Amino acid sequence: MHKHSATADMLPISAFSPLKFLGGVVATPQGPVLWDATTTPVPFQAFPCPPAITPINQFVNYQPAPAMDKIWRPAFEDYRGVTMRPALPEVPETSLRPALQELPEPSSPQSQSSVDDDTDSKEDVTETLECAQALTDLKWGTVDPPRSTSPVTASTSSGVSSDLQKAKEQAIRRYRLIEAKDLGKLVVRGPKKDKRDPDFYIKKVPLHFS
């Protein structure tokens, strides 16, 4: 059998190998072979394998990590495809109180004496609260039907049920009116109005998250 020499068995070392700068000693099965300058030159390959030892000076090109608020992060998109903007700064707790607490009672003389530009909105809020209370009473069955003075309607249960039905329809009608007024542009009248779910409005109406 033909016996291979040590230099023939050794893998060719390119001139750009970091081992050349580290002393030129290559570990092979035959033992350490020193760098031989007379070997056949190998065409350059740009690092066919990662270098064994990377000579890094860890104090060169040192940069402190930037603060997290200085890093530019692209806006991510939520599952609806709406671009979410960064959250607003925290609001103090005093402004988080519900606005209904600051409104005076409708029966107090102060609300009647002070005439502001917000009278319509206060009346709307009061009306909304009354309608919500009426609907809650209707749901739990705690409505007191209006007592009729005539003994005939009082004796018949049909009169009481008709009065209750009338009050129920009136409360629901007022509630729907206020709901339509609050929704504003979201209320679309048409043959398919009942089939439209909230996703329809989220897709069609441009919602700005700020």
Curated annotation (Swiss-Prot):
Region (Disordered) residue spans: 101-166
Listed Low complexity bias regions: 101-114
Chain intervals with Polar residues compositional bias: 147-164
Domain of life of the organism encoding this protein: Viruses
Protein name listed in UniProt: Uncharacterized gene A6 protein
Source organism per UniProt: Alcelaphine herpesvirus 1 (strain C500) (AlHV-1)
